[in-house]
UniProtKB/Swiss-Prot annotation:
Active site residues according to the UniProt entry: 101
Native species: Sinorhizobium fredii (strain NBRC 101917 / NGR234)
EC numbers, comma separated: 5.4.2.8
InterPro entries: A-D-PHexomutase_a/b/a-I, A-D-PHexomutase_a/b/a-I/II/III, A-D-PHexomutase_a/b/a-II, A-D-PHexomutase_a/b/a-III, A-D-PHexomutase_C, A-D-PHexomutase_C_sf, A-D-PHexomutase_CS, Phosphoglucosamine_mutase
Catalyzed reactions per annotation: alpha-D-mannose 1-phosphate = D-mannose 6-phosphate
GO terms for biological process, alphabetical: carbohydrate metabolic process
Protein encoded by which gene: noeK
Protein name, per record: Phosphomannomutase
């Protein structure tokens, strides 16, 4: 199976994207922009990238293709996806972000942005159709490396400026924060922003070899490493992100990661959001805990953004969205503490990190205390890697076909009281435990999300769910 659009962007094997596929899709994107009148011939198109080995070459291939299509490519270098999107909004320019986000190192991807933000599902279909039409065009598929004017400093600085005045200069004073740098494009930017608000930042775990970090399914080895750092350095928190810095990672003082949907909820409270858009996989306690209107969507930023756009069209103000991975999106303009935060409808890791740290400082309590204050159902998630797309699709289809199939497969866990198939299949067992399975849209993986009343019950349910799914012969 070749590269295809997943939950956010085009994804595929790096060996496939380093070649004609990237040229083809960059050309198709240019054609869509021109055909729809979103840009004029000769328009600027920004290109950014993460630190994967293949990203620089894919970016160069895309820049050459953009130039052949009549665009003017601008090289923004290695920077966070939200930084690229923000700079694109400032310039009124479309953009391409070369990143595979959190997926394994042998894969990569391309995220596409219109001048006002991330493309939607209809745009993805249009780009795919144009790519099919252009696939036999030698010019559209030509592989050559191009260049663009260097705007890396301008784009990065503009993103840092967004958060410079969000908190007082001493807003994080007194915190000793570990920064797990690995191969995140935000590793130096986070240092600048956190130190700018008074935090003592200690870098750990920097790597020149790409390390995929999935903030929604943190490995046991990574959790052990985080806990060891927290103890060794007496950190108040450890912060990090995935590869392209649109998903945050934040731990408490023990090195225990905070759930991404909790970070989103904290952010919503800090900014006094009036409407939250979030996928069905986010914690079921969000509605009660937030006290505001919550719109549930399918998994994927395009669906969350569509819900925010619809809410703004209805006249709603202070609209924001977040996913279970912690990426926060602002659908409308916000203000906080005298600072303005213009809308940025793409996932961002910095805002939720700052929000949670600031809440801890203001409450004069460790982050573990902030978690306890929110009293959400205990939610965990995991995944089965190298789970073929066709196998996961067949499994979900089998389960959706009849209640008997569901009961047969999950009888060892308990009696299923209800199901929801908005995205994958969500099972509610008698007693209120929840198990949600869905195929990943980005990699050959099967995702499993659970909720229960206490940590032990949640861990047991997750282990049971993964065991059942692993042994399924469907």
């Amino acid at each position: 199976m070749g590269p295809k659009f997943g939950t956010s962007g085009l994804r595929g094997l790096a060996t496939e994207l380093v070649g004609s596929v990237s040229a083809l899709y960059a050309t198709a994107f240019s054609r869509m922009l021109l055909d729809r009148g979103r840009v004029a011939p000769g328009a600027t198109v920004l290109v950014g990238r993460d630190f994967r080995d293949s990203s620089s070459e894919i970016a160069a291939i895309c820049m050459a293709a953009l130039a052949r299509a009549g665009m003017v490519p601008v090289d923004c270098g290695g920077l966070p996806t939200p930084a690229l999107a923000l700079y694109g909004r400032k310039l009124g320019a479309a953009s391409l972000m070369i990143t595979g986000s959190h997926i394994p190192a042998d894969r990569n991807g391309i995220k596409f942005y219109l001048p006002d933000g991330e493309i939607n599902k209809a745009d993805e279909q249009a780009i795919t159709a144009l790519a099919e039409q252009l696939s036999a065009d030698a010019d559209a598929t030509r592989v050559e490396c191009g260049r663009g004017a260097d705007h890396s400093s301008e784009a990065t600085d503009f993103y840092i400026q967004r958060y410079e005045t969000l908190l007082p200069k001493s807003g994080l004073k007194g915190l000793k924060i570990g920064l797990y740098q690995h191969s995140s494009v935000a590793r130096d930017i986070l240092t600048t922003i956190l130190e700018g608000h008074g935090a003592n930042v200690v870098p750990v775990g920097r790597s020149e070899v790409f390390i995929p970090v999935d903030t929604e399914a943190i490995s046991a080895a990574t959790c052990k490493m985080l806990a060891a750092w927290a103890k060794e350095f007496a950190f108040d928190a450890i912060v990090s992100s995935d590869a392209d810095a649109d998903r945050p990672l934040l731990t408490d003082e023990t090195g225990t990661p905070l759930r991404g949907d909790l970070l989103g909820l904290i952010c919503a409270r800090l900014l006094e959001a009036k409407l939250i858009a979030t996928p069905i996989t986010s914690n079921s306690g969000i509605e009660a805990a937030s006290g505001v209107e919550v719109v549930r969507t399918r998994v994927g930023s395009p669906y969350v953004i569509a819900a925010m756009t619809e809410a703004v069209a209805r006249g709603k103000q202070r609209v924001m969205g977040f996913e279970a991975n912690g990426g926060v999106m602002l659908g409308s303009n916000f203000s906080f503490g005298g600072a303005s935060l213009p809308a940025l409808p793409t996932r961002d890791c910095v805002l939720p990190i700052i929000a949670a740290l600031h809440m801890a400082v203001e409450a004069k309590t460790p982050l573990s205390g902030i978690v306890a204050m929110h009293r959400l159902p205990v939610a965990l998630s995991g995944r089965i890697e190298n789970y073929p797309f066709d196998r996961s699709d067949a499994l979900v289809a089998f389960l959706k076909a009849s209640k008997a199939n569901v009961s047969h497969l999950f009888s060892r866990i308990g009696r299923v009281a209800g199901t929801d198939d908005v995205d994958g299949l969500r099972l509610t067992f008698e007693g209120g435990r929840i198990l949600h399975i869905r195929p990943s849209g980005n990699a050959p993986e099967l995702r499993c999300y659970v909720e229960a009343d206490d940590p032990d019950a949640a861990e047991h349910l997750l282990a049971q769910g993964l065991a059942v799914l692993n042994s399924s012969m469907v």
